[in-house]
Amino acid sequence: WCEFVSLPENSPEAMEAHTGVPAAEVRGAARLYANAANGAIYYGLGVTEHSQGSTMVMGMANLAMATGNLGRDGVGVNPLRGQNNVQGSCDMGSFPHELAGYRHVSDDIVRHQFENHWGVTIQSQPGLRIPNMFDAAIEGTFKAIFVQGEDIAQSDPNTIHVESALRSMELVIVQDLFLNETARFAHVFLPGTSFLEKDGTFTNAERRINRVRPAMRPRTGKHEWEVLCDVAKAMGGTMHYDHPSQIMDEIATLTPTFAGVSFERLDREGSMQWPVNDANPDGTPIMHIGKFVRGLGKFHITPYVATDEKASRRYPLLLTTGRILSQYNVGAQTRRTSNVAWHPEDVLEIHPADAEERGIRTGDDVTLASRVGTTTLRALVTDRMTQGVVYTTFHHPVSGANVVTTDNSDWATNCPEYKVTAVQVSPGKSAATAETNHPAHRLNALVRMANQIARQMAADNTGDPVAATALDRKSTRLNSSHT
């Protein structure tokens, strides 16, 4: 590794040509980090949403090991998760290649443990990642999808490709708080529950497991885990729980890092940081003290490999997308609040020189085009942007920012390369702009369907005709508001 970093092509001077960051600043930042008593690295999607995102994370881990910034308070390599419980979802095996506790499906011992407990057979080969699902759906080999709490039709890159995949499937089930863009393709829509109605745990980026308690019962009458149990039962499965604490007990039984976790302990003692087991009965505030699980740390070679997405004569600008403080992700929740006063629409930020060259002024409608799609946004001319780079957000479905982003992704994780898309910007609206608004008749049908499901769930759970009547009145208001 030392030989690798000493190569001339890996020097700050060589990298300056690729990044535009002066070599002197890179050296100064490196010395500041290396000489700090405690140096902590925090990173977000600006690092990972590149074709070489995983390589960059490995590079940061190399820096932390080389400078001794691991295994004690105030140091480490710390990902800033996009929202609460991303860590918890990963811990529970929300990957196509791992079971709970980050154990690979190819491990026969681990797989058989889960098979014996669940009474099912688990494939030893990894499943599909989301982009692979879309490709397989278009090819006709992927037939159905169950989407919970995610709007893939708005958030995933290359919207036209995603919509084609959704249309190709025989069954699309969407479970969410709101009728989002993906719900336009749903054969079945199931109402979801908010965090105020959930009973369970959230785990944050420091591996801290916190209890989450409901402030109210779900308006639909059932928790999401109960709905999943009903679906499993209808499909011939045996998934059954009477309380979410039983789910945590199963997690503790099957996952060594959670072996000592229970609702009873969390309610009595407060939050806990995994691993919590016989070796660490009170939890583990700091990991990697003195050594790693594998022993000594392993330095990874991290060669620079340029993205395949490059500016060209036809697409001379580079688009990067991101978020803004007042809106959250695809805006399914925040667009329904007064936050729209601060961010009523997605705009395209463009450098004054690039705007002048194209005859564009602030407030003008502009066409944003890439090799995969075209959309229309309003321009914001600002020297905040670097010349040659444009920026927009993706909070509003009408702007369809992901219509133009491509299928390029990280080499290891398939995380989309949202930060680099070659585009052209021209004045005026595009005739090819994708229409992403819900057709009124389709939206009304979905509203009626969702309310019918909610009424049935409420009746099944409580037998209360008053609740069903209240939902009928709400259904009328909802349909009127969307007509």
Name every feature range the model reports, one short phrase each.
Residues 178-213:
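Flexible glycine/proline-rich, aromatic-decorated loop/lid segments
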Residues 164-168:
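Short, conserved loop/helix-junction motifs that constitute active-site signature segments
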Residues 90, 95, 113, 244-338:
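Long, low-complexity segments enriched in small/aliphatic residues
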Residues 15-21, 44-51, 83, 149-154:
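Conserved short loop/turn motifs at secondary-structure junctions
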Residues 218, 222-272, 278, 337-349, ...:
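Long, contiguous, secondary-structure-rich segments that constitute the structural scaffold
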Residues 1-36:
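Long, well-ordered, tryptophan-enriched scaffold segments
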Residues 33-135, 278-280, 290-296:
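A glycine-rich, hydrophobic/aromatic-adjacent loop/helix-cap motif
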Residues 39, 145, 172, 189-191:
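Short, well-ordered beta-strand core segments
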